[in-house]
Amino acid sequence: MVDALNLGKILRVHATVYVAAEPVPLFWPMRTFIYNNPLHGLEGLPFTEAVQAARGLFHARVYLPRTTYQHYLREGKGDVRMLDAITAQFAQTAPSIDGIDWQRWLSAVRKAPTDASPYVPHASAEDVAAVLAGQAIPNGSAIAAGLDAAMLADLPPWRPLTECIDSLWGTNLAAELDELVVKSCLDFFDEDQSSWRMPGRKQGFYAAWADVARRNGRMFLRGLAIKRILDQAPRADAAIVHVMQSLGIAEEHWQAYFSRELLRLHGWAGFIRWRSGAEHYHWGRKHPADLVDFLAVRLVFALALIEESARHRKTPANRPAFDAFLREQRDCALLRYALHAGELLPGWAQRIDDALERSSGNRIARLAEDYAKEWRRVHAQRQGQILQKIAMEAGTPVQTLAALGAQGAAEVLEVLQRFAVQEGSMWLRALEARAIDHLLSQIVTPDEPAVPKRAFAQALFCIDVRSERLRRNLENVGDFLTFGIAGFFGVPVGFLGYGKGSETHLCPAIVTPKNLVLEISAAIDFDEEDFVSTLGHVLHDLKSSVISPFVTVEAIGALFGFDLIGKTMAPLAYHRWRSRLDAPHPFTHLLLDKLSREQADSIVRALQRAMIVNALRIELGIERERVNDDMIRELRETALGHCSGTTILVREFGLSLEREARFIEQVREVYRVNSSYANYQMLRLGRIGFSLDEQVNYVWTALTSIGLTRNFSRFVLLIGHGSHSENNPYESALDCGACGGSNGLVSARVLAQMANKAEVRAKLRTIGVDIPADTWFVPGLHTTTTDTVELYNLDFLPPRLLVYLERLRNGLYAASRLSAAERVPTLLPQAKTLKPAQAHRIVRVMSHDWSQVRPEWGLSGNLYFVVGRRGLTQKANLHGRSFLQSYDWQLDPKGRLLENILAGPVVVGQWINMEHYFSTVDNTHFGSGSKVYHNVAGRFGVMTGNLSDLRTGLPAQTVMRHGQPYHEPLRLIVMIEAPLDFARRAIEAVAKVKSLVQGQWVRTIILDPTQDMQAYVFDDGEWQVHFISASQSTYTEEVVTA
């Protein structure tokens, strides 16, 4: 048995796993989809370095293929002058070689009608020089060249041993390992989807899995020695040490080894990594697990598979044995690598297979020598042909190539290797340069009338790109003034909805709310028992039943059949009919004010009494009607230690003193009627609501941050947004990211309720924000799949405003239909000529059609993030591609509001942008593939087919159309309207944003209103004065056309 680990070793293992997991992107449950940069763990590096690291870690593409960029360039979406300038800058770093014009050579590579790299890895410069000179490949140690180097580079000591064995013996150990781990994860992490659940999950992942694995007969029959391994390592950290020592992996390689193991299933690892840090996640508290558990399970399985393979196939049982095989049987290893892992040359498979099966060492050596020579020749010829094509396109004489020699060929290959790495970033910068010019060309200096006219209504929308169309159309159809603000309206809340038993965080994922808001029926009186019961959910982990127990299985089946037919054949009409069957949601209001200590104490007392009643019934069989309030009070006081002596249980019910004492102890420990838990409950209840000062601060901050501090309209609309679609696991990805993947209605209701309070307005008046008595804040919801806006809490609307309500609704309705008419052609290219009414009906039908894989494009197409006054872009059509954050630097003398905008909305916007970028450039590795093959896993994620890694990122239907990118993967272009030095100080003050700007994860523009709107762009490590390219007029917006 492994010796008990000392504390230092335990901490070292945990720390190593923690660091190894940094490249693993976090994965939130699908029901609250959170956009996230897949390379978040690499954001400390500059963008270009991070994507190169990710290419190796995720085995993924990080830029689009060259031919796609060429297509964009032909459509006018790239700045040719910028591309030529970047190419020329790179050419200056190349060594001078007689006869080679590097600018023309690299331009020829750029224009080649192929996605192939100009550089062939492992092609020898000496061999390439011979090919170009028309000579034979030189003799020499063929074994020591090319193929040998490729094999050793592919099998480093930190690569998982299962993969290494697969590479030489053609086994399937790594895939088998993935399958076993996924099955174990499904069993443990299931959230009431499966009919069978792993027992003992409260112990934690590794302990529960180990208990099951010890008794798993199928593994025993297969010959997997799981039990023997577990006997050596009862704890997860001990198991990791035992396996790594058994495999002979040197400790200096553990971190890299762990990273590779975790990234094999980065979806599951990312979910567990998020889950272990989510303190309020119900399932995480109930069934704990962390990446040490996950890695331990994986490594134990890996060791068992490796040992089984060693027994049956005579493969190495550890890394030292594997390395010995590479050294002592290099010829055999080379042939095995060529057959199972390398790029096998045509016509060699049967010869190598026969030799490995039946031949002696001498024949294997000769075959390896012959194959290596042929491998060298093929790679050299391939590289030579590429160079000849480039030379022909660049106008370089053939004689120049023939005269290169080995040294010259090495210099050429080194330049092409560097260019192959950097070419993608060159294309990216050229496209971004054109996009920057396109944005700046539409900017106008906002008009500031001396006496501002009072608009009919002001509307605060989420900064989400899908709000841009609706805002623009609303301003065009009527006297509306719109603003952009983060969709949680600056108020982070935990929310407990009516009839719900768990809390939802309505704020960005990087924020943890301190305050809790309850939704309660308007009919409930504060002193009633129902109200106390509602608050009880705050203190207990309760879950609602998914299907009512009063409905029979047959009835469910019949209703499901109706659903299937209705949602497919007539989705809109069926939705209207079906909604009549659902119980109506009662009229509710939000509990926003803090509870007094007396109110909180009465709630705790009521809950304690309820728990004692339950204890009497469950533990002693004494029903409620047999006890009165005085008896319950006596038991409560005894349990809390406020009184001593015998209780009614002895006097009235004849219990022995021993049984009475045991019952009181059960009430204290099991039912938690004790002083310490009462204090905890009081702290929990203290989270409910906001103090008056908090409410004033949140309203002041929200209004000031967007520049709305005077000239209020009668209506101030607070429009959150959400989505509606059928049969869509990714529905929450279409909701509000600023609200933690939920819709924004509750956040709108919270701020509206605060802003409408007379006490709040009175205090706001003292700090410079005077909201007129005839102004009313109205919450609403923009459903992005249908482009509709519905207003809420109109029952509270003052009677004097009712006369204007129809005008308000008509304006919103007209804007909705115009927005639908813009959006439908992006979904259905054949529907370009639809009238607004027709388009509006089509999007409503699509949102209720459960066969629809793309009810909307969501945030696909996002490109810009504008921080400034609405007047900058009010006359521009940004085609639903821009986040629009209202901001007036003149109301922010210290820059604190700008810092908050940068630290919050801009960072979230960058997450959204990067999620779309990487899901587009490689949907297989960074995205989640096609929805068609998705199955829900455990109610928190999706898999491809029945068993796979959890699919992270966005599905193909969100970012691709007909196999080509719909979303144009460019970095987020952030434009800030503020004086240059003022904006720079704000950026410097927020460390995360400073890193993103300097690392070029976002492209940043400062638009200085004190210098006649002069633009400064951060590039090459400095702020540069920017002038719009003369060729800007050729830019087109393909995203909104077929």
From Swiss-Prot:
Part of an energy-coupled inorganic carbon pump. It is found in: Cell inner membrane. Its main location: membrane. This is Probable inorganic carbon transporter subunit DabA. It comes from the Bacteria. Forms a complex with DabB. Pfam families: DabA. Zn(2+) binds at C462, D464, H721, C736. Its cofactor is Zn(2+). The keyword Signal does not apply. Belongs to the inorganic carbon transporter (TC 9.A.2) DabA family. One of its GO terms (cellular component) is plasma membrane. It comes from Nitrosomonas eutropha (strain DSM 101675 / C91 / Nm57). GO terms for molecular function: zinc ion binding. PANTHER family: INORGANIC CARBON TRANSPORTER SUBUNIT DABA-RELATED, UPF0753 PROTEIN AQ_863. The keyword Zinc applies. Keywords: Cell inner membrane, Cell membrane, Membrane, Metal-binding, Transport, Zinc. InterPro entries: DabA. It is a peripheral membrane protein.
